Protein backbone atom coordinates (compact mmCIF):
# COMPACT_ATOMS: atom_id res chain seq x y z
CA UNK A 1 0.00 0.00 0.00
CA UNK A 2 2.70 2.50 1.02
CA UNK A 3 4.90 1.47 -1.91
CA UNK A 4 2.03 1.82 -4.38
CA UNK A 5 1.24 5.28 -3.03
CA UNK A 6 4.93 6.17 -3.27
CA UNK A 7 5.11 5.31 -6.97
CA UNK A 8 1.72 6.83 -7.90
CA UNK A 9 2.54 10.15 -6.23
CA UNK A 10 6.04 10.06 -7.73
CA UNK A 11 4.59 9.57 -11.23
CA UNK A 12 2.22 12.51 -10.76
CA UNK A 13 5.09 14.66 -9.49
CA UNK A 14 7.31 13.75 -12.45
CA UNK A 15 4.53 14.71 -14.89
CA UNK A 16 4.07 17.97 -12.97
CA UNK A 17 7.81 18.69 -13.28
CA UNK A 18 7.60 18.17 -17.03
CA UNK A 19 4.52 20.40 -17.30
CA UNK A 20 6.04 22.93 -14.87
CA UNK A 21 2.90 22.84 -12.71
CA UNK A 22 4.08 24.33 -9.41
CA UNK A 23 0.78 23.73 -7.62
CA UNK A 24 0.82 19.98 -8.30
CA UNK A 25 4.53 19.84 -7.44
CA UNK A 26 3.82 21.42 -4.05
CA UNK A 27 0.94 18.98 -3.51
CA UNK A 28 2.90 15.83 -4.38
CA UNK A 29 6.62 16.31 -3.76
CA UNK A 30 6.32 16.66 0.05
CA UNK A 31 4.51 13.28 0.16
CA UNK A 32 7.02 11.16 -1.76
CA UNK A 33 9.63 10.43 0.90
CA UNK A 34 7.16 10.13 3.82
CA UNK A 35 5.50 7.23 1.99
CA UNK A 36 8.91 5.68 1.35
CA UNK A 37 9.72 6.00 5.06
CA UNK A 38 6.44 4.30 5.96
CA UNK A 39 7.22 1.51 3.50
CA UNK A 40 10.66 1.08 5.09
CA UNK A 41 9.24 1.03 8.63
CA UNK A 42 6.72 -1.63 7.62
CA UNK A 43 9.12 -3.92 5.73
CA UNK A 44 12.33 -3.58 7.72
CA UNK A 45 13.33 -6.36 10.13
CA UNK A 46 15.71 -4.04 11.96
CA UNK A 47 14.82 -0.38 11.70
CA UNK A 48 17.76 1.97 11.39
CA UNK A 49 17.07 5.28 13.09
CA UNK A 50 19.99 6.80 11.21
CA UNK A 51 18.45 5.87 7.87
CA UNK A 52 15.08 7.37 8.82
CA UNK A 53 16.82 10.59 9.88
CA UNK A 54 18.80 10.57 6.62
CA UNK A 55 15.59 10.33 4.60
CA UNK A 56 14.12 13.20 6.61
CA UNK A 57 17.12 15.38 5.72
CA UNK A 58 16.64 14.42 2.07
CA UNK A 59 12.95 15.30 2.41
CA UNK A 60 13.80 18.78 3.75
CA UNK A 61 16.29 19.25 0.90
CA UNK A 62 13.58 18.37 -1.62
CA UNK A 63 11.25 20.99 -0.14
CA UNK A 64 14.02 23.58 -0.44
CA UNK A 65 14.59 22.68 -4.09
CA UNK A 66 10.95 23.38 -4.98
CA UNK A 67 11.57 27.12 -4.52
CA UNK A 68 14.21 27.02 -7.28
CA UNK A 69 15.99 30.14 -6.01
CA UNK A 70 19.70 30.33 -5.22
CA UNK A 71 19.09 30.93 -1.51
CA UNK A 72 16.86 27.89 -1.04
CA UNK A 73 18.94 25.71 -3.34
CA UNK A 74 22.02 26.48 -1.25
CA UNK A 75 20.33 25.34 1.97
CA UNK A 76 18.86 22.37 0.13
CA UNK A 77 22.35 21.29 -0.89
CA UNK A 78 23.48 21.60 2.76
CA UNK A 79 20.66 19.33 3.95
CA UNK A 80 21.36 16.89 1.13
CA UNK A 81 25.03 16.85 2.12
CA UNK A 82 24.04 15.82 5.65
CA UNK A 83 21.85 13.10 4.13
CA UNK A 84 24.80 11.88 2.06
CA UNK A 85 27.11 11.75 5.10
CA UNK A 86 24.56 9.75 7.10
CA UNK A 87 24.07 7.29 4.23
CA UNK A 88 27.83 6.76 3.92
CA UNK A 89 28.07 6.15 7.67
CA UNK A 90 25.30 3.55 7.50
CA UNK A 91 26.73 1.76 4.47
CA UNK A 92 30.30 1.69 5.77
CA UNK A 93 28.93 0.21 9.01
CA UNK A 94 27.27 -2.57 7.02
CA UNK A 95 29.78 -3.40 4.28
CA UNK A 96 33.45 -4.31 4.33
CA UNK A 97 35.80 -1.41 3.67
CA UNK A 98 37.96 -2.13 0.58
CA UNK A 99 41.68 -1.40 0.39
CA UNK A 100 42.83 2.04 -0.75
CA UNK A 101 44.01 1.04 -4.24
CA UNK A 102 40.76 -0.67 -5.39
CA UNK A 103 38.79 2.19 -3.84
CA UNK A 104 40.77 4.76 -5.83
CA UNK A 105 40.32 2.77 -9.05
CA UNK A 106 36.59 2.45 -8.45
CA UNK A 107 36.32 6.19 -7.84
CA UNK A 108 37.91 7.21 -11.16
CA UNK A 109 34.66 7.14 -13.24
CA UNK A 110 32.89 9.30 -10.65
CA UNK A 111 35.86 11.69 -10.38
CA UNK A 112 35.84 12.14 -14.16
CA UNK A 113 32.14 12.96 -14.23
CA UNK A 114 32.42 15.44 -11.37
CA UNK A 115 35.38 17.22 -12.97
CA UNK A 116 33.51 17.58 -16.27
CA UNK A 117 30.32 18.87 -14.63
CA UNK A 118 32.25 21.27 -12.39
CA UNK A 119 34.07 22.75 -15.38
CA UNK A 120 30.77 23.31 -17.21
CA UNK A 121 28.91 24.81 -14.24
CA UNK A 122 31.69 26.72 -12.48
CA UNK A 123 30.47 30.15 -13.63
CA UNK A 124 26.91 29.44 -12.46
CA UNK A 125 27.87 27.96 -9.10
CA UNK A 126 30.21 30.80 -8.13
CA UNK A 127 31.26 30.49 -4.49
CA UNK A 128 28.86 27.56 -4.07
CA UNK A 129 31.25 25.47 -6.15
CA UNK A 130 33.11 24.67 -2.93
CA UNK A 131 29.98 23.21 -1.34
CA UNK A 132 29.37 21.24 -4.52
CA UNK A 133 32.95 19.95 -4.39
CA UNK A 134 32.55 18.84 -0.77
CA UNK A 135 29.39 16.97 -1.70
CA UNK A 136 31.26 15.59 -4.69
CA UNK A 137 33.95 14.10 -2.44
CA UNK A 138 31.34 12.11 -0.52
CA UNK A 139 29.54 11.05 -3.70
CA UNK A 140 32.82 9.96 -5.31
CA UNK A 141 33.73 7.97 -2.20
CA UNK A 142 30.33 6.26 -2.10
CA UNK A 143 30.49 5.57 -5.84
CA UNK A 144 33.96 4.01 -5.62
CA UNK A 145 33.00 2.10 -2.49
CA UNK A 146 29.84 0.70 -4.11
CA UNK A 147 31.58 -0.23 -7.36
CA UNK A 148 34.48 -2.03 -5.65
CA UNK A 149 32.19 -3.98 -3.33
CA UNK A 150 30.03 -5.00 -6.29
CA UNK A 151 33.07 -6.22 -8.26
CA UNK A 152 34.63 -8.05 -5.31
CA UNK A 153 31.39 -9.51 -3.95
CA UNK A 154 28.66 -9.97 -6.54
CA UNK A 155 25.33 -10.22 -4.75
CA UNK A 156 21.91 -8.60 -4.72
CA UNK A 157 22.72 -6.15 -1.94
CA UNK A 158 25.81 -4.74 -3.63
CA UNK A 159 23.97 -4.54 -6.96
CA UNK A 160 21.17 -2.52 -5.34
CA UNK A 161 23.68 -0.21 -3.69
CA UNK A 162 25.69 0.37 -6.87
CA UNK A 163 22.66 1.12 -9.07
CA UNK A 164 21.21 3.40 -6.39
CA UNK A 165 24.50 5.29 -6.08
CA UNK A 166 24.77 5.73 -9.85
CA UNK A 167 21.20 7.02 -10.11
CA UNK A 168 21.78 9.53 -7.31
CA UNK A 169 25.09 10.68 -8.81
CA UNK A 170 23.57 11.28 -12.25
CA UNK A 171 20.66 13.03 -10.56
CA UNK A 172 23.08 15.60 -9.14
CA UNK A 173 24.76 16.11 -12.50
CA UNK A 174 21.45 16.68 -14.30
CA UNK A 175 20.34 19.01 -11.50
CA UNK A 176 23.25 21.31 -12.40
CA UNK A 177 23.25 20.83 -16.17
CA UNK A 178 19.61 21.91 -16.45
CA UNK A 179 20.76 25.51 -15.99
CA UNK A 180 22.42 25.30 -19.42
CA UNK A 181 19.30 24.26 -21.34
CA UNK A 182 16.15 26.16 -22.19
CA UNK A 183 13.95 23.07 -21.76
CA UNK A 184 14.96 22.60 -18.14
CA UNK A 185 11.61 20.95 -17.36
CA UNK A 186 12.66 17.82 -19.27
CA UNK A 187 15.91 17.52 -17.34
CA UNK A 188 14.11 18.22 -14.06
CA UNK A 189 11.68 15.37 -14.78
CA UNK A 190 14.58 13.03 -15.60
CA UNK A 191 16.38 14.13 -12.43
CA UNK A 192 13.29 13.25 -10.38
CA UNK A 193 13.04 9.82 -12.01
CA UNK A 194 16.65 9.11 -11.06
CA UNK A 195 16.12 10.48 -7.55
CA UNK A 196 13.02 8.37 -6.92
CA UNK A 197 14.59 5.17 -8.26
CA UNK A 198 17.81 5.86 -6.38
CA UNK A 199 16.00 6.36 -3.07
CA UNK A 200 13.81 3.31 -3.60
CA UNK A 201 16.77 1.04 -4.44
CA UNK A 202 18.70 2.36 -1.43
CA UNK A 203 15.70 1.56 0.75
CA UNK A 204 15.56 -1.93 -0.75
CA UNK A 205 19.27 -2.29 0.03
CA UNK A 206 18.59 -1.38 3.66
CA UNK A 207 15.70 -3.85 3.93
CA UNK A 208 17.73 -6.63 2.28
CA UNK A 209 20.67 -6.17 4.65
CA UNK A 210 18.55 -5.98 7.79
CA UNK A 211 18.04 -9.58 8.85
CA UNK A 212 17.88 -9.14 12.61
CA UNK A 213 14.55 -10.04 14.22
CA UNK A 214 14.69 -7.20 16.73
CA UNK A 215 12.57 -4.83 14.67
CA UNK A 216 12.84 -1.80 16.94
CA UNK A 217 16.56 -1.86 17.65
CA UNK A 218 17.57 1.65 16.55
CA UNK A 219 21.30 1.13 17.03
CA UNK A 220 23.65 0.49 14.12
CA UNK A 221 26.32 -1.89 15.23
Where are these regions (language model features)?
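Polytopic alpha-helical membrane-helix bundles and their juxtamembrane interface segments
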Residues: 1-221
